[in-house]
Amino acid sequence: MPTISKEEIERALDAWAEHLLLTPVVQSGAPLAVVGIVSHGDVLARRLVNRLEKAGCQALYGAIDITLYRDDLDLRGSRPAQRSSHLPFSTDDLYLVLTDDVLSTGRTARAALEVLWEYGRPAKVEFHCLVDRGGRQLPIQPDYAAFNLTVTPEQSVRVRLHEIDGAEDITF
């Protein structure tokens, strides 16, 4: 099973933060928020905000739970555990970077956008992910993907992050 190492993930996060720092919106000094989708996307968002702040760029951090906005709740049989969102600011007029670990069908990103509208009207929203594995079912594409993998629908992509999983790698 192919693996992307912790070191490769760290280098990818450095490049991701550098990409954000070089965007015209950030260069202009516009207010920036990095919001992660619980549970791995919020860890990535926190890491990105830390990198941005070390580079002198102020960025708000937030996390959203999309559980109640999923379009497959009726298909799952049991109700999945809901976690809390942490978005202690209005998103009005912000440049908002929505982050997640893996982009596949696009359904999670769609649900996340729906949650965001409840917190205000951002000036701009971009979707960034650690891994784009393809397999879209909705017309959603990432504005930035650290890794683009070519996998079949049957193959799984597993992201482990130290803060949640106690280990760090991507296997596929």
Spans of features found by a protein language model:
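PRPP-associated nucleotide enzymes
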Residues: 1-172
